[in-house]
């Protein structure tokens, strides 16, 4: 156990790791934040403002803030709208113009969630970022790999294929080992 020193007094308090959780206000990210808090992480909720067509992003941010308040965790909104347009929307449009079939989810994960969000969170003192993705992280031979989620019907590991090992060492996927039905049960039992 890691020990911390405070005013020259030794304590047996485990060093708490800080995780910034990307929160949409939906079931999966809300339960992810709850599970990480239950595991002893210092959880910070973050809503990524990426696309605010017809005010939908504002509603998601309100919902995420309500959940963060219920969990008693700090909450931030990171405005990434211009970067999202530049790195995801423009990429998608350019790909279509060039006769390609883009996957905006893959690009959003690479550039926004596990690019800009991860970098910003780390610069603010986070040890990890987490999301409500259904995927598993497995360490084998000292290397990190993405594996299919336990719930094959919800698996999102395909959308994360661009993440290199240096990023995988800084991310958590708390829902990777559980079924969606269990996630819903957790949500209703916690009244989030």
Placement of each model-derived feature along the sequence:
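ATP-dependent adenylation/nucleotidyltransferase module used to activate substrates
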Residues: 1-161, 172, 181-183, 188
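Short, intrinsically disordered, charge-balanced linker/junction segments flanking boundaries
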Residues: 190-192
